Regions:
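Short helix/loop capping segments that flank catalytic or ligand/cofactor-binding pockets
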Residues: 67-70, 89-91, 105, 156-157, ...
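Short, surface-exposed beta-strand-loop junctions and turns on beta-sheet-rich folds
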Residues: 35, 43-44, 102-103, 195, ...
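Active-site pocket-lining segments that scaffold enzyme catalytic pockets across diverse folds
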Residues: 111-187, 191-195, 238-243
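A short, Trp-centered hydrophobic/proline-enriched beta-strand micro-motif
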Residues: 22-31, 57-59, 144-146, 176-180
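Short Lys/Arg-enriched alpha/beta "domain-start" segment
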Residues: 1-54, 152-160
């Protein structure tokens, strides 16, 4: 697939996102590589890793958990997607990639909205019981590591503005990966200081962060200390086993 490249400088990458309000779209800020990728309008479902090289960028989504049966996740994941339009910022350059005809891109002003919301989840009692069970299990030696998660529901009297949320995530999380994916009126957004796996050519890297060892100051741990610490090694083995 041939992509045409045009220089394009926007005040915010979220402005590109706003130019495609009714399309499937993806937003990605990579702090490690200092790269921003915004894609819009599905071009193709990528068949496999070999087919992936026919496109400038592809987005892979997966829920990972077999128990994710909630309708809100229906149709999201388990596929690689190539987009028709991309906005890229990397190596001091900003440009617009498009397969086929270009569209006029406006530098839309991104709204900054303060959302007033409240938690409306109703499972706090179940969560407390789960935490007590985990604590008892660890105390009795039945388990060594548990990663627990809970879905929390928030409700606002006004619609949540995704563009504003993305902008706030970018501005307030300078050391995180920022992501957004919108499909069929549903949007998955977030920020994380870690990614489970990065695949580049023959390299597979993991940015998995955990632990409380100091990284700065006079008490900062050295590379040798981290690699030889028994507790740290046990945690790594447990994480790899769980993965």
């Amino acid at each position: 697939m041939i992509y045409n490249k045009e220089p394009l400088q926007l005040n915010s990458p979220v402005a590109f996102w706003l130019n495609f309000p009714n399309e499937e779209r993806v937003f990605w800020v990579d702090r490690q590589s200092n790269r921003i990728v915004v894609g819009a309008k599905r071009l193709a479902t990528v068949k496999d890793d070999e087919d992936r090289h026919n496109y400038a960028y592809v987005f892979y989504g997966d829920t990972f958990f077999d128990t994710s049966k909630d309708p809100k996740w229906s149709g999201m994941g388990h596929e690689m997607i190539a987009f028709t339009h991309y906005y890229i910022v990397e190596n001091g350059e900003a440009f617009y990639l498009h397969a086929g005809e270009s569209v006029s891109i406006e530098d839309i002003e991104v709204p900054h909205i303060r959302h007033d919301f409240r938690e409306t989840s109703d499972d706090k009692g179940d969560w407390d019981r789960l935490m007590n069970a985990i604590s008892d299990g660890i105390g009795h030696g039945e388990m060594t590591k548990v990663v627990a998660s809970r879905e929390v529901q928030f409700t606002s009297d006004t619609p949540f503005n995704v563009a504003s949320i993305l902008t706030n995530l970018v501005e307030n999380n300078p050391n995180c990966f920022i992501f957004g994916y919108e499909k069929d009126g549903r949007t998955f957004v977030g920020a994380s200081p870690e990614i489970l796996v990065r695949h580049r050519g023959s390299e597979i890297l993991s940015y998995a962060l955990a632990g409380t060892a100091p990284k700065d100051g006079p008490n900062a741990w050295t590379k040798e200390q981290l690699l030889s610490d028994k507790k740290n090694l046990l945690n790594i083995i447990s994480s790899v086993t769980v993965s």
